[in-house]
A protein has these predicted regions:
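Short acidic/polar alpha-helix capping motifs at helix-coil junctions
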Residues: 4, 82, 176-179
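Sec-dependent N-terminal signal peptides
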Residues: 4-14
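Detector for intrinsically disordered, low-structure N-terminal pre-sequences
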Residues: 10-11, 23, 207
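Sec/Tat signal peptide C-region and signal peptidase I cleavage site
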Residues: 15-19
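Charge-rich, well-structured scaffold segments of protease-associated domains
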Residues: 20, 42, 99-227
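His/Glu-rich zincin catalytic helix
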Residues: 20-101, 123-126, 132, 136-139, ...
Length: 227
């Protein structure tokens, strides 16, 4: 897949000023250097784009990283970054409920999302001829998520996250070890003193408005890197 094609596809979706896109870094392999060559661009809307080409297989991997994780949560609202990761798969203005999963798998691809303390990322690996479709999916939920958020979806994912905490932490041998470790390593209120999964009482406390405010503050092209 040519670099120019990828750039045009995402710029058309996220920005109207292709000519202003800036190449800010280029790494080239020289000889037998152990280095991954790539080109790094910054779009006029602040989006960072990193491109690495490898034609050994007819596949493309798309990763969108938002520079926000559990460390950006407010005290009393822990677990929200991870909760929001779940909501990002529940449809957007032009993508129906659960359709994101169906579109990627129908294209012969795989997908997932992960959250840690400092970032949240979403990714797909698909046949290379499906690249533009993946970029469109990511652009749609970056720009057009909020109107598709409903109270019903919110409650379903709240229950899902609470169940995930029960399975992986509360009801698992030594599952709370990391939580106790974090509490003792960092003082109260430190953004690393709670786990990404959050506390059940905090998950019960948040509402749809909290979710929308979180999206508006952190989910935008100027806080994202596409690789």
């Amino acid at each position: 897949m040519k670099i120019q094609t990828l750039l045009i596809a995402f710029v058309v979706l996220c920005s109207s000023a292709f000519a202003q896109t800036k190449l800010v870094e280029k790494v080239v392999r020289k000889g037998n250097e152990l280095v991954i060559p790539y080109e790094k661009y910054v779009l006029p809307n602040g989006l960072t784009l990193i491109i690495h080409e490898d034609h050994s297989d007819p596949l493309v991997h798309v990763d969108v990283t938002y520079h926000v994780g559990s460390a950006r949560e407010e005290i009393g609202k822990s677990g929200f970054a991870h909760f929001f990761e779940h909501m990002m798969f529940q449809g957007s203005d032009n993508v129906a409920d659960e359709q994101h999963f169906k579109t990627v798998t129908a294209a012969g691809g795989t997908l997932n999302g992960t959250t840690n303390r400092d970032r949240t990322n979403y990714f797909e690996t698909v046949p290379s001829n499906q690249l533009e479709k993946m970029l469109w999916l990511e652009a749609d939920r970056m720009g057009f998520l909020l109107d598709a958020v409903t109270q019903k979806k919110f409650e379903v994912q709240r229950a899902t996250v609470k169940n995930e905490r029960g399975q992986n932490y509360d009801n698992r041998p030594y599952g709370l070890a990391q939580e106790y470790l974090a509490k003792n390593m960092y003082p109260y209120g430190h953004p690393y003193s709670w786990l990404t999964i959050g506390y059940v009482e905090d998950l019960d406390r948040v509402n749809v408005d909290d979710l929308k405010n979180f999206f508006l503050r952190w989910y935008g092209p100027n806080n994202a890197t596409v690789t």
